[in-house]
Amino acid sequence: MAILVLKVLGLIACLGLALMLLLLELQLGRAPRLGPNPDPGPLEASFLRLVVPVYNEENNIVACLDAVLASQDPGLPWELVVADDGSTDATEGLVNERFQVDQAGTGPARRLLDVGPRPEGERWCGKNWPASQAAALDWPAGDPRGQWLLFIDADLRLEPAALVAVLQEVAGGRAEGLPVDLLTLAPRLECGCLAEWLVQPIVASLLGLGFPLKRSNDPVDATAFAAGPFMLFRRSAYEAIGGHRAVAGEVVEDLALAGAIKASGHRLLYLLGIDLVRLRMYRDLESLWEGWTKNWYLGVDRNPFKAIGSALVVVGGFSLPWLLLPLGLLDRSLGLIGLVAIGLQLAIRFWSRIRFGTPLRYWWLAWLGGLLIGAIVPASIWKTTTGQGWTWRGRSLA
């Protein structure tokens, strides 16, 4: 009986992996993609404020600012605001040092903003407080519909052509007669440490399936998704939905903001931006564990069935097939089923390499990545539900 059950589970894993490969090609392989604009035209924008909310980002901030300051001239006045949320490491000093290096050079106006303590009696999560304070700075005179507010994370890296490309897109990127009010880009995910290689390729595939771009871009579909590391708002739309203040207590604020944009009748445009922006989310297992246990349960709407279901899908699809290989010594068909499933895992990674340039590194450790995600999910449910250990960079989210 046990052999039969394993055969059935293995066949389900094969079917699920094959379906995943097909859906990835249909939803991401053919998704709208934004790249450098070789022939930029006139802009509708009159001003751009680029905001980097930071808290203890000494390992990221210099490279982030270097990339921003290396941007091609966007063709309009712009400013760079680093909104420091009370960093206790070297972040502030590094920002000041970087800003002083080329003060006489061209580029944006630069400002390091100390956002001060969060209001007593109010719940502010994550980067919502520094983001809201940077957005509330004085704006130049002019129509707010022509002014833009770009939020990027400190672990994001802009390519030199990124700002020009996105401003050109919002100038001409119209669908169904609606102007773009929020442009968000899915970045190219980069991995460094082993923990990232185990988890991030699997998570990227799940996100691609769970948040289809086509539905997010459909004005009449309620589906709304935004990639928090890169969100470009039309100022008038941002203020109309209440900005980050309206989602102050949300841990996954990007989804809340995207939902508010669509619910208010504004236009959301979600594109693949892998040729323009790169993101490395975590530096080690500890930060990866903290990050995904913070977000996973919220990402499935605090639904325990979806959460446990996602864990079972990952463990069944990526870990079980490797267990079937040695069991092939007992039953040859078990080993064959395991080989087919592992071949499909490799096919998914090959697809990711062809479409997005993701290296095949450590693909054979997918079983370990599946087990790690299988542990992340119940930990995320526990942390989010009880508040115990639910932190980001050491700050409690409860």
Describe each PLM feature range:
Residues 90, 152-169:
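Acidic donor-binding/catalytic loop of UDP-sugar-dependent glycosyltransferases
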Residues 84-94, 117-119:
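A conserved acidic beta->alpha catalytic loop
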Residues 1-44, 201, 209, 213:
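N-terminal membrane-anchoring/stem segments of glycan-assembly enzymes
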Residues 47-49, 79:
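Cell-envelope/extracellular polymer assembly enzymes that use nucleotide-activated donors
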Residues 170-209, 236-239, 244-307, 395-398:
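Catalytic donor/gating beta->alpha subdomain of glycosyltransferases that bind UDP-sugars
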Residues 42, 306-387:
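Membrane-embedded multi-pass helical conduit in multi-pass membrane proteins
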Residues 20-24, 114-138, 169-241, 245, ...:
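Long helical/loop segments within the catalytic core of UDP-sugar-dependent glycosyltransferases
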Residues 66-77:
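Short, acidic, metal-binding catalytic loop of nucleotide-sugar glycosyltransferases
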